[in-house]
């Protein structure tokens, strides 16, 4: 019986050791990817924040009616959801999906969805939520190419009045262990009080290049969401894999203890049998 128990524990030790190798390797890969994603995030964030300041001044100077500021009359809402292509990243994806579900459950008929990432597509399909478009296999360092494709689709849907409001749903990165799901409204723009700078003059008039301004702003915004999402994904995966590796180490310690106790018991029993046999022969 003890021999069978020892064989079973050996198998478990081998299995857990193999799993630990995988989780440790994935943790190291995620750490390297996170480092790269954070550098990319800082670069994009500076560009995005500067563009926001410029856009605010431009919008505040527009006095004529404009659908990108005053709305287009449509009651449909578009949610662009940023998820990951790969799993094993803790609650990263499910937190985003849960936020979307809570947001659209009161008005499903007027809620439309564009999803980014294989995992988001899979979750939405299981929930029976149809999508207008799906974007997968996004590179670890997203570029303006991916952002431009999505931005053009958003502009097309909004300008054709298929949607009246556009929201970006993504995970804002703060640290490897802290991310927050945000639902950011990007269209129509919110007009604030007229700019304090009365000496700004646009030539030609802003309205003549509004479409170009809008596309560039959406590209910057989407790229910022991509950068936050990738950093959050890799931070979540690194944390999850490090936690799994720690759990595997704890389990191996317990299995080693069980193995040694069982082996000691088997040795003691064998010695007792030998001694007992010797006594019987006297």
UniProtKB/Swiss-Prot annotation:
Gene Ontology process terms (BP): proton motive force-driven plasma membrane ATP synthesis
InterPro entries xrefs: ATP_synth_F1_ATPase_gsu (IPR035968), ATP_synth_F1_gsu (IPR000131), ATP_synth_F1_gsu_CS (IPR023632)
Keyword line: ATP synthesis, Cell membrane, CF(1), Hydrogen ion transport, Ion transport, Membrane, Transport
MF term (GO), any: proton-transporting ATP synthase activity, rotational mechanism
Pfam families noted in UniProt: ATP-synt (PF00231)
Coiled coil: none
Places the protein is found: Cell membrane
Organism domain of life: Bacteria
GO cellular component: plasma membrane; proton-transporting ATP synthase complex
Keyword Cell membrane: yes
Topology of this chain in the membrane: Peripheral membrane protein
SUPFAM superfamilies associated with the record: ATP synthase (F1-ATPase), gamma subunit
Family: Belongs to the ATPase gamma chain family.
Complex formation: F-type ATPases have 2 components, CF(1) - the catalytic core - and CF(0) - the membrane proton channel. CF(1) has five subunits: alpha(3), beta(3), gamma(1), delta(1), epsilon(1). CF(0) has three main subunits: a, b and c.
Function: Produces ATP from ADP in the presence of a proton gradient across the membrane. The gamma chain is believed to be important in regulating ATPase activity and the flow of protons through the CF(0) complex.
Protein name: ATP synthase gamma chain
């Amino acid at each position: 019986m003890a021999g069978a128990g020892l064989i079973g524990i050996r198998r478990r030790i081998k299995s857990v050791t193999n799993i630990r190798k995988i989780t440790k390797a994935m943790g190291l890969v995620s750490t390297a990817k996170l480092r790269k994603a954070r550098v990319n995030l800082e670069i994009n964030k500076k560009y995005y924040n500067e563009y926001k300041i410029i856009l605010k001044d431009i919008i505040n100077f527009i006095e004529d009616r404009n659908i990108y500021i005053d709305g287009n009359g449509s009651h449909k809402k578009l949610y662009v959801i940023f998820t990951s292509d790969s799993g094993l990243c803790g609650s990263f994806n499910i937190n985003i999906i849960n936020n979307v579900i809570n947001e659209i459950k009161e008005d499903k008929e007027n809620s439309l969805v564009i999803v980014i990432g294989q995992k988001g597509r899979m979750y939405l399909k299981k929930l029976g939520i149809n999508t207008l478009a799906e974007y997968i296999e996004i590179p670890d360092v997203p570029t303006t190419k991916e952002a431009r494709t999505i931005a053009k689709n958003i502009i097309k849907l909004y300008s054709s009045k298929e949607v009246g409001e556009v929201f970006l749903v993504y995970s804002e990165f703060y640290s490897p262990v802290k991310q927050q799901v945000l639902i950011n409204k990007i269209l129509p723009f919110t007009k604030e009080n007229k700019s304090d700078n009365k000496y700004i003059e646009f030539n030609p008039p802003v309205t003549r290049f509004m479409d170009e301004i809008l596309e560039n702003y959406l590209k910057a915004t989407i790229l910022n969401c991509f950068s936050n999402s990738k950093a959050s994904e890799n931070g979540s995966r690194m944390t999850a894999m490090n936690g799994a590796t720690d759990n595997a180490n704890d389990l191996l310690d317990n299995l080693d203890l069980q193995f040694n106790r069982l082996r000691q018991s088997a040795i003691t029993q064998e010695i007792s049998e030998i001694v007992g046999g010797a006594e019987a022969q006297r």
